[in-house]
């Protein structure tokens, strides 16, 4: 079990995360966790009680990084704090390379220039990180027209009540899934799967002829 989790960490986690509000012991939470495993979410956050309906997860939670939070406000604060810490650490690496080059009285080497380019991309990604709420609300952006940032935290509500006002207050953007039939909504679990796959469709580079290998599809993130 630990080996499988480590392998997923090494080769197929993506930098987006998801959070689910657990106020109604909703069976869709397990479905969302299962989809997070399938679509390579780096972390799953459960907001509310630690006890949640695991039936739909089919034990995939054992291979995910699952964190628990007492409130959506605490989750948002800790996520933004972590992003700020990564920005500071990356900027420190950039500055250190420049200082080393100046101390040698020579320009950056080709390898250092490449590292600076990679750092610039990481910093740009971090500066554009967002918390995104998935809900059908006035002013929300249709998912089909929305460009997900590479680093993001996707917020999903419980079946029925949807996201709490506290969650919506923490969101940078609100996105909804366009629907065209007589039904006015889809399940929270289905919505989570659609949103995660939309992120993958925008950011993942699927290697090979388009078929999954025996151990799953091989993919990387656009750089």
Residue ranges and their predicted role:
Residues 1-223:
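Post-transcriptional modification and biogenesis factors for structured RNAs
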């Amino acid at each position: 079990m630990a080996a499988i989790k480590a392998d997923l960490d090494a080769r197929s986690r993506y930098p987006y995360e998801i959070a689910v509000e657990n106020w109604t012991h909703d069976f869709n939470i397990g479905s969302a966790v299962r989809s997070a495993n399938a679509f390579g979410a780096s972390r799953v956050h459960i907001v509310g009680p630690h006890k949640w309906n695991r039936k739909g997860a089919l034990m995939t939670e054992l291979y995910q990084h699952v964190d628990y939070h007492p409130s959506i406000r605490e989750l948002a604060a800790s996520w933004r704090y972590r992003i700020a810490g990564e920005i500071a650490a990356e900027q420190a690496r950039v500055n250190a390379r420049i200082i080393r080059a100046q101390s040698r009285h020579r320009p950056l080497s080709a390898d250092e220039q490449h590292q600076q380019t990679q750092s610039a991309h990481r910093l740009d990604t971090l500066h554009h990180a967002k918390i995104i709420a998935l809900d059908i609300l006035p002013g929300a952006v249709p998912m089909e027209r929305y460009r997900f940032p590479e680093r993001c935290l996707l917020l999903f509500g419980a079946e029925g009540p949807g996201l709490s006002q506290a969650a919506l207050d923490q969101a940078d953007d609100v996105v909804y899934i366009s629907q065209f039939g007589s039904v006015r909504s889809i399940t929270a679990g289905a919505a989570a799967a659609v949103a995660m796959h939309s992120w993958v469709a925008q950011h993942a580079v699927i290697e090979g002829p388009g078929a999954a290998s025996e151990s799953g599809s091989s993919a990387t993130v656009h750089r």
